[in-house]
Each structure stands twice: as structure tokens, then as C-alpha cells.
């Protein structure tokens, strides 16, 4: 078994290892990409459209406090764009390690927040003027346009979810999640990828091959049979593509029950 897992891990280096598996689309996830285009393009003519992004930022921060990066895999407008529009034309390559590295993620987050805050402070001086809302909205519009262009190019030439590896909003969610976890809020509210029985796992690695973020669930299940990786966006793509049909999205309490049930059998 160890030998098989080592061989599979080495296969990650192959360019054709990753599969363009169909995503699981709810109505929101299926059409949320329209919001990105509306703000990024339409906002150039009507800057106030950018103010809607404030609601997005509030939503992802609050949901992350309870459920981790669930927003990324189920509600995110950019995620919808990458999965719905760019996936079919993506080269779907292995995401370079440096884009996933801590220095890159932390460094880009600091760089982004510094520039965003600097511009926000400058705009705040216009408070009370006629142009304040337009200038504030345009700040978010330009940000969305940047992600549309940069994230779109990375999606086409590397992998659909390349941007998500170092996305500042993803980092913000992880900070919110860590706070929620420290306060014990996530214990009952967070659902994680759960394997009903490790013994039934084929170790085929398909959960990794279809994972939008190229994570390796089959190698990282905890003692509670849950995938605890903070980067998991809980999109259920691996759940739908597991050949053994032993994966599901469960709370910790339900995961323990599933483990006990499998043990009895």
C-alpha cells in the first residue's frame, strides 16, 4: 500500500495527471460568474456597481468564521467564473509550488492589503463630496478587473483555480476561520470532506486528480476520517468523483458516527 501511494504521488509530476472533472453546480455557483463580469466590465461605465463587492467581502468573511473556505467552493463569483467559463479551455496543468508557498501567499496578501488600504485612505478624504461613492466603487471595480485578467490568464494557461492559491480574500477567509476555530465555533458548524472507512479507499488518488486546488485528501485523512486541510474549499468535486463512493461532506460529529458505524460492520 505504501509503495502504491508513493507511485501515485510521483505521478503528480505528470502533465496529464489532473482531470477536468465536472464541477457540482448549485444555481448560485452556476451563474455567480455573471456578477464578476458585471462589476469588472460594467463598473467601468457605472463605478457604483463596485460597491456591491463590499457585500461579497462581508459574506465571505462571516461564512469563513463558521465554515472555513466553503464560500470559495460554493458562492465565490470568481470561482464560478474559473469553473464554469475557463475550465473547458484551461490547459489544466500542475500549479507551480511557489504559487502555493507560504511566502507567496503571505507576501501577496500583505502587498495587496497595503495597496488597497493606501488607496482607500486616499479616497476617504473625499467623504461628503459628490464623487466619493464613484471613487470608492471604482476601487473595487479595478480590483475585480485585475482578478478577471490575471486570474483568467492563469486559469487558461495553468489551471482554473491557480488564482485561488494566493487569493487575498482566500487568505482573509483563513484568518477568519482560524479565529472561529480558536473560539470553538467551527466544531459544530464546519463540514469537511469525510471518508466513511479508510480501509475501503482504493488509494487511486482520483480525489486528488479532480481537486480544483490540487490537494491530496486520500493521503491526509485524520483520525476522525476527515480532511483537515485549511485550503479545502469544500466544493464536493472529490465526493462526486470517488470511485468507491465513500466520501461525503460532514460535520465532526457525523464523521465520528460514520467511523463507528463502519467499525461495527
Descriptions of predicted regions:
Residues 1-225, 230-233, 237-265:
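Non-ligating segments of multi-cofactor redox enzymes
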Amino acid at each position: 500500500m505504501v509503495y502504491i501511494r508513493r507511485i501515485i504521488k510521483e505521478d503528480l509530476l505528470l502533465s496529464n495527471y489532473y482531470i477536468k472533472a465536472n464541477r457540482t453546480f448549485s444555481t448560485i455557483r452556476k451563474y455567480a460568474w455573471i456578477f464578476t463580469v458585471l462589476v469588472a466590465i460594467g463598473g467601468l461605465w457605472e463605478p457604483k456597481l463596485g460597491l456591491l463587492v463590499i457585500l461579497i467581502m462581508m459574506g465571505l468573511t462571516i461564512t469563513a468564521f463558521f465554515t472555513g473556505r466553503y464560500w470559495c467552493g460554493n458562492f465565490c463569483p470568481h470561482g464560478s467564473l474559473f469553473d464554469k467559463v475557463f475550465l473547458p479551455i484551461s490547459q489544466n496543468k500542475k500549479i507551480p509550488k511557489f504559487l502555493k508557498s507560504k511566502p507567496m501567499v503571505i507576501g501577496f496578501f500583505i502587498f495587496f492589503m497595503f495597496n488597497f488600504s493606501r488607496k482607500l485612505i486616499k479616497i476617504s478624504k473625499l467623504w461628503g463630496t459628490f464623487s466619493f461613492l464613484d471613487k470608492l466603487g471604482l476601487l473595487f471595480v479595478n480590483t475585480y478587473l485585475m482578478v478577471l485578467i490575471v486570474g483568467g490568464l492563469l486559469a487558461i494557461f495553468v489551471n482554473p483555480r491557480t488564482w485561488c492559491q494566493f487569493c487575498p480574500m482566500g487568505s482573509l477567509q483563513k484568518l477568519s476561520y482560524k479565529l472561529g476555530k480558536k473560539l470553538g465555533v467551527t466544531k459544530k458548524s464546519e463540514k469537511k470532506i469525510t471518508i466513511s472507512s479508510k480501509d475501503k479507499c482504493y488509494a487511486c488518488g482520483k480525489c486528488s486528480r479532480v481537486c480544483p486546488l490540487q490537494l491530496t485528501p486520500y493521503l491526509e485523512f485524520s483520525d476522525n476520517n476527515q480532511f483537515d486541510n485549511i485550503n479545502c474549499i469544500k466544493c464536493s468535486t472529490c465526493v462526486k468523483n470517488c470511485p468507491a463512493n465513500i466520501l461525503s461532506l460532514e460535520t465532526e460529529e457525523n464523521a465520528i458516527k460514520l467511523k463507528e458505524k463502519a467499525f461495527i460492520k
